[in-house]
Amino acid sequence: MIDSILLVDDEDLFHLVFEDACSLLDMTLSLEAISSSDEADKLFEKWFKEGNSNEKPQCVFVDLNILGSSFDGIELIHKINHDYGNGVVIGIISSSDDNQEIEKAKEAGSQFWIIKSDEIEPRLEEFMMDYPKYENKTAPFKVYR
């Protein structure tokens, strides 16, 4: 079970859609939603420097294209995995299903890719069933369509 999630997405409306989906799936958790990759980078840098893994979320969902940010979701995932030692389940949540982007995300260290839509609940439910394998690092990369 996921206790804490960080959602990095520039669309405030999707923050609400995601939160509603989590509620409908009876996911009791701490959900923090932020709008920029820069803000997420600063949080991970803080957690890394302080060595405080208690504040770090268990799972991070990152939008592919984050407007107003210095870098996109794939670059953020690469940075988290390589600069901060990861320690979280992390993947992309995007309306794109471009195979080249999906492959880039996988190479950057993304563990999953969820196709974003207003009807996100079935994909999140399927992801939640797979989550223990992601947490144990035994799940293969998967695209949830």
Task: Label every PLM stretch briefly.
Residues 122-145:
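CheY-like receiver
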Residues 71-86:
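Short amphipathic alpha-helix used as the core "switch/output" element in two-component signaling
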Residues 87-99:
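A short, hydrophobic beta-strand element within the central beta-sheet of small alpha/beta folds
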Residues 33-59, 123:
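Acidic, metal-coordinating helix/loop segments flanking the phosphotransfer/catalytic sites
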Residues 62-65:
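Active-site residues of response regulator receiver
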Residues 71-75, 96-114, 118, 122:
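Alpha4 helix (beta4-alpha4-beta5 surface) of REC/receiver domains from two-component response regulators
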Residues 55-59, 84-89:
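His-Asp phosphorelay/catalytic-motif detector in bacterial-type signaling
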Residues 3-22:
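Conserved acidic segment of CheY-like receiver
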